[in-house]
Amino acid sequence: MYKGIFLCVLLAVICANSLATPSSDADEDNDEVERYVRGWASKIGQTLGKIAKVGLKELIQPKREAMLRSAEAQGKRPWIL
């Protein structure tokens, strides 16, 4: 009787132990996909950041040539040298 209980408990421990450890194949696949996505996301973010910087500079800073020409057309001395 004790022999049957012991074998049942031993089988339960072995099954629980093997289920608790993750397989390495699944982790490698997830890491590879995660690295791939993370790499593309950072590159896209950097590109969008550069585009935004250039766009904001163009909007905020007026063109010097246009300011010089408009000042000359009005007969004023341009303040930009």
UniProtKB/Swiss-Prot annotation:
Tissue expr: XPF is synthesized in the stomach and stored in a novel granular multinucleated cell in the gastric mucosa, it is stored as active, processed peptides in large granules within the granular gland secretions of the skin.
A GO biological process held by the record: innate immune response
UniProt keyword Cell membrane present: no
Keyword set includes Coiled coil: no
This protein's UniProt keywords: Antibiotic, Antimicrobial, Cleavage on pair of basic residues, Secreted, Signal, Vasoactive
Pro-peptide positions on chain: 21-37, 65-73
Compartments (UniProt record): Secreted
Family: Belongs to the gastrin/cholecystokinin family. Magainin subfamily.
Name the record gives this protein: Xenopsin peptides
Organism: Xenopus laevis (African clawed frog)
